[in-house]
Amino acid sequence: MADYDLAILGGGPGGYVAAIRGAQLGLKTCIIEKDKLGGICLNWGCIPTKALLKNAEVYNTIKNAHKYGIKVDKISVDFPANIKRSRDVSNRLSKGIEFLMKKNKITHIYGMGKLTSKTTIETKSSKKKEKVNAKKIIIATGTRPRSFPGMEI
């Protein structure tokens, strides 16, 4: 069983910022996340969406270039390249967070975490199970929208 002063369950913006701050305060810190660091917004929601919107904005600017006396003969959209760019943007930012974890000597444990006591988290990944003991635990798992009967999302 690994021992830490602080364990963070969840690698989104709440979790990774808390982990960095804990490490800055001198705490032996780990962060438990099943996926890439950064959370839903960075990896699958806000950031990739904004990258795709920027692609659309650039397309629209080129499409209207004639209004500025610029002639463009042919314009087309390469959808796979657009998706690749949005993934590349997200991956670059997530790797930046990984760098900050290493720089601050924070252990990133890949897997799902389950509280088994007030100081113990059992982690499970496709490769292994382990227990983490921590004096303090922060739950920063984010949220999902709740569906109500008759109002499914």
Give short role names for the model-derived ranges.
Residues 15:
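N-terminal Rossmann-fold NAD(P) dinucleotide-binding loop
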Residues 2-4, 20-27, 32-152:
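Glycine-rich flavin
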Residues 1-12:
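Beta1/beta-strand and adjacent pyrophosphate-binding region of the FAD-binding site
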